[in-house]
Amino acid sequence: MAGTTAGYIGHHLTFLSSGEGFWAVHLDTLFFSIVSALIFLFVFRNVAKKATSGVPGKLQCMVEIVVEWINGIVKENFHGPRNVVAPLALTIFCWVFIMNAIDLIPVDFLPQLAGLFGIHYLRAVPTADISATLGMSLCVFALILFYTVKSKGFGGLVKEYTLHPFNHWTLVPVNFILETVTLLAKPISLAFRLFGNMYAGELIFILIAVMYSANAAIAALGIPLHLAWAIFHILIITLQAFIFMMLTVVYLSIAYNKAEH
């Protein structure tokens, strides 16, 4: 662990990676995103296996509330077949929420635990890594194109990006540029919104942790600040998971809507 404040912050913001440059793989991001997915699958699978028609347990009630809530959102906003979109929305919300929630674990706990196994760098919050959020948003981007082609055909896709908003052949280049920028803005905004909020939240936790190494008065101030930020951060991690899920559903609805253009 680095001895200076700058070194401490830099240490906590360094990924456990393999390779260099563009091709570097952030192993910690990969590991914790997979663990988060397994937690989601384990919980929902167990609830589904133990579901009863009688009085449900607390966990079953919570899962049923989340499933019905998200199914209602999809039903209200997506007017096509929901056999894929509804499970996708549920997966996105729960997966992103679990990954975000890792940020509530004390910032030194997991890195120090990893240090016992000879791992010197570890960042545990996958959604504070732009490569992870971009990866998820690119998957959404691919689904947008898929649902556009599915509902309008390839010819409809071409028309959508060449004859809108100006329906004249002389303005095809202008239409193409405008629609391409609009299309690319969707995954980019999805990725950077989630990344920016979670990175800022992680950094604030690190800065508060720095206070504990100062004098007793500042260290004592850090305790209520840490608690207050953790409570507020619960709202942030939930809201960001909801926004990512909601925008995905809206974007897919726009792509599928045959009467859109």
UniProtKB/Swiss-Prot annotation:
The gene is atpB. The keyword Zinc does not apply. It holds the Pfam family ATP-synt_A. Key component of the proton channel; it plays a direct role in the translocation of protons across the membrane. GO terms for molecular function: proton-transporting ATP synthase activity, rotational mechanism. One of its GO terms (cellular component) is proton-transporting ATP synthase complex. GO terms for biological process: proton motive force-driven plasma membrane ATP synthesis. It is found in: Cell inner membrane. The chain crosses the membrane at residues 24-44, 85-105, 129-149, 203-225, 239-259. The keyword Transmembrane helix applies. InterPro entries: ATP_syn_F0_a_bact/chloroplast (IPR045082), ATP_synth_F0_asu (IPR000568), ATP_synth_F0_asu_AS (IPR023011), F0_ATP_A_sf (IPR035908). Keywords: ATP synthesis, Cell inner membrane, Cell membrane, CF(0), Hydrogen ion transport, Ion transport, Membrane, Transmembrane, Transmembrane helix, Transport. This is ATP synthase subunit a. It is a multi-pass membrane protein.
